[in-house]
Amino acid sequence: MPQLTNGAKALLLANIAVFLLGLLAERTGFEIDKNLGLFYIKSEYFKPLQFITYMFVHAGFMHLFFNMFALVQFGSMIESVWGTKRFVFYYLVTGVGAGVIHIIVTHLQLMPFLDAVDAFFANPTPDALVALGTSTPVFKDAAIMELADRWRTGFYTDEQIIEAFEQQIPQAKAMLFNTPVVGASGAVFGLLLAFGLMFPNLKLQLLFIPIGIPAKYFVILYGIAELFFGIKDFSGDNIAHFAHLGGMLVGFLLILYWQRNGRRYE
């Protein structure tokens, strides 16, 4: 374990403090994730400041532990080369960038649903209902298909279907819009990317894995895994994979910018 540097220590303490305050706030009914977590831009809970605050909020102790372990493990070595100001700047920028990319990807994923909603209410037909139902996992395909078939046969009237979905669509939007992303993972993945570039051949001795893996290979494999799970929409794990990739991407672009402007690693 590397010696804890000043910037990494400050970030570590800030994350722990917010976590403890969140536990205390729960007793008063204050939901820290609803106030500091990052929401989709069309959510009623969205605030621009959440692009910064979300990275200091964690979903639980293990979420906090693994992010802070990585912060200390990778961040201290990076800070010892870059210095505190540059290190903290990089951490915050990659965290914000990860949040921005997460929101962009979320918007792209929700566009088919939002377009299908508009199309359905503009021209409510059984086919438009099927398109609406298959545009989001909120609605079960089999149930929508059965509902559309009954509508076609006259079992339900146009007015009944429209009235039902006028009530269900706001609920579906709330479910899709009002799930916040929290955690320092985006910034941590930015640190991981920087570590792999700065110390490519240094072998990482990971928890639960007794074999050392060169940092450059670990970063590549981890990035590929995140891309795979993100593309496959592996939402069952409740992990914002594209936020992780966003932290790596923003970190890479920032380091590339520094290199081209005469600021090397050392």
What spans do the regions from the language model cover?
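A detector for small-residue-rich transmembrane helices and their helix-helix packing motifs
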Residues: 1-266
